[in-house]
Amino acid sequence: MNPLKDLRASLPRLAFMAACTLLSATLPDLAQAGGGLQRVNHFMASIVVVLRGASVATVTIAIIWAGYKLLFRHADVLDVVRVVLAGLLIGASAEIARYLLT
């Protein structure tokens, strides 16, 4: 095999990649799709707000349920702890999403 022949065959591809790299380095606005990045950020921020609201509701319901079971049904503490821990883990999902998105 002739290495020069292989190089000549891939030369247009290398030139195209070099041109794309040069354009993306000099014109970063093209890479951001004309404001599309801000729309995605706004959408993700609204998802985080919804997750925070759901997490507050989930933790509140879990604690109310646990208190009801302990006070009125005389449930074992170990049975109630599982539900409270699950509620806290679900409630932490909004903050984990916030941490990953920022």
UniProtKB/Swiss-Prot annotation:
Leader sequence segment: 1-33
Protein name, entry field: Type IV secretion system protein PtlA
Bilayer topology annotation: Multi-pass membrane protein
Keyword Plastid carried by entry: no
Keyword RNA-binding: no
Family (UniProt): Belongs to the PtlA family.
Keywords: Cell membrane, Membrane, Signal, Transmembrane, Transmembrane helix, Transport
Expression induction or repression: Cotranscribed with ptxABCDE. Activated by the two-component regulatory system BvgS/BvgA.
Location (main, coarse): membrane
Protein purpose: Component of the type IV secretion system ptl required for secretion of assembled pertussis toxin (PTX) through the outer membrane.
A cellular component term, taken from the record's GO annotations: plasma membrane
Record's subcellular location: Cell membrane
Transmembrane spans: 47-67, 77-97
One Pfam family in the UniProt entry: TrbC
